[in-house]
C-alpha cells in the first residue's frame, strides 16, 4: 500500500494493519492503539446499503498531515498514522484507520480519539449514505437528501 503515514486509500485497496503498526513502532513504543472504522448496516433507523466516500485529495492529505503533526505536538506519543478509504464501500468494509503508538496506553488512547474526532470535523472527505429510503449526504449529525 505504500509507506506513508497519511494516505487516502482508493477502493479496491484496503488497509494493511500489520504494515501500519510497523510504520508507527519503535523501541520506545510501550503500546499501540488502533481505531478501525467500518460501514455499519443501520443508521438512524434506516438500512444502510453502502457508503460512498469522495475527497478533495490534495486538501484532504494536507489536513490529515496537519492533524497528525498537531497530535504529535499536543500529546506525548511516539507516532501516529491516518489512512482513509475513498470510493464505494459495502457494509462491513473498513473506512478509516488511525494507529497511535506511545510509551503509555493512556496517551495513545487519548491521541487516537482526538485524531478521529479532528478527521471527522476538518478533513474534506464527503460521505454519501445509500439506504433503503434513498441517498443522503452525511454532514456531522445532519443527513441531507441527495437531489437528483
Swiss-Prot record:
It catalyses: 2 [molybdopterin-synthase sulfur-carrier protein]-C-terminal-Gly-aminoethanethioate + cyclic pyranopterin phosphate + H2O = molybdopterin + 2 [molybdopterin-synthase sulfur-carrier protein]-C-terminal Gly-Gly + 2 H(+). This is Molybdopterin synthase catalytic subunit. Keywords: Molybdenum cofactor biosynthesis, Transferase. Pathway: Cofactor biosynthesis; molybdopterin biosynthesis. Transmembrane segments: none annotated. Gene3D superfamilies: Molybdopterin biosynthesis MoaE subunit. Heterotetramer of 2 MoaD subunits and 2 MoaE subunits. Also stable as homodimer. The enzyme changes between these two forms during catalysis. It is an enzyme of class 2 (transferase). It comes from Pyrococcus abyssi (strain GE5 / Orsay). Belongs to the MoaE family. Signal peptide: none annotated. Pfam families: MoaE. InterPro entries: MoaE_sf, Mopterin_biosynth_MoaE. One of its GO terms (molecular function) is molybdopterin synthase activity.
Amino acid at each position: 500500500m505504500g509507506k506513508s503515514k497519511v494516505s487516502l486509500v482508493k477502493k479496491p485497496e484496503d488497509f494493511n494493519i500489520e504494515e501500519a503498526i510497523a510504520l508507527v513502532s519503535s523501541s520506545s513504543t510501550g503500546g499501540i492503539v488502533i481505531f478501525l472504522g467500518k460501514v455499519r448496516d443501520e443508521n438512524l433507523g434506516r438500512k444502510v446499503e453502502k457508503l460512498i466516500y469522495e475527497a478533495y485529495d490534495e486538501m484532504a492529505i494536507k489536513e490529515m498531515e496537519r492533524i497528525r503533526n498537531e497530535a504529535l505536538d499536543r500529546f506525548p506519543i511516539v507516532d501516529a498514522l491516518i489512512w482513509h478509504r475513498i470510493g464505494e464501500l459495502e457494509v462491513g468494509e473498513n473506512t478509516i484507520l488511525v494507529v497511535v503508538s506511545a510509551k503509555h496506553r493512556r496517551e495513545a488512547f487519548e491521541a487516537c480519539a482526538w485524531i478521529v474526532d479532528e478527521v471527522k470535523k476538518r478533513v474534506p472527505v464527503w460521505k454519501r449514505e445509500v439506504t433503503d429510503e434513498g441517498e443522503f449526504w452525511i454532514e456531522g449529525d445532519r443527513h441531507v437528501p441527495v437531489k437528483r
